[in-house]
A protein has these predicted regions:
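ATP-dependent adenylation/nucleotidyltransferase module used to activate substrates
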Residues: 1-151, 155-156
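Short, flexible loop segments at boundaries between secondary-structure elements
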Residues: 153-167
């Protein structure tokens, strides 16, 4: 974990990702990427010299109409003294039952991102942190190339003016 914290600290400083007084919504899927990010940001608060607040947010798409079980994530957030919110959505129903998408990933991702932005604003956050790794970046690059005919990937920091939030 020490090596990961070093990488996180370097990225925070190099890309000016966190400032004093920031309130950061951490998107938590329950997977290893988002949980490592959450733990890392919680640990860094102790010694990085930047005062910031963390809010954990999980979007439950309720695939097949069934709510997810995020009790282990809730327990982790409680142990880290991080407020945690589960947002029940109808994304699964919209993507699969109403729209009947043949390639659901893009629509699902856009809907989740929009719902996360709304939730972050609702809970007073000015920034959103998402856990990604190299495989995510490569997958995004290839999907953009084949599906949209463009070369591109996500940047470490972006600003969404219509929501006044940094992601």
């Amino acid at each position: 974990m020490q090596k990961i914290l070093g990488y996180m600290r370097k990225a925070i400083q190099e890309f000016d990702l966190i400032s004093d007084g920031d309130s950061i919504a951490v998107g938590i899927s329950g997977g290893k990427d988002s949980l490592v990010l959450l733990n890392g940001l919680a640990l860094l608060r102790r010694f990085i010299g930047i005062d910031y607040r963390l809010v954990g947010i999980t979007l439950d798409p309720q695939f097949k109409g069934t709510p997810g079980d995020f009790s282990s994530v809730a327990g982790l957030c409680s142990g880290l003294d991080i407020k945690y919110h589960i947002i029940q959505t109808h994304i699964g129903e919209i993507v699969f039952d109403i729209r009947k998408e043949e390639n659901p990933c893009s629509l699902c991702a856009r809907m989740r991102r929009g719902a996360l932005h709304d939730a972050a604003k609702q809970y007073g956050c000015n920034k959103i942190a998402l856990g990604h790794h190299y495989n995510d970046a490569i997958e995004t690059f290839i999907m953009n190339l084949f599906n949209e005919g463009r070369i591109g990937c996500f940047s470490p920091k972006s600003y969404l003016s219509r929501k006044d939030i940094t992601s």
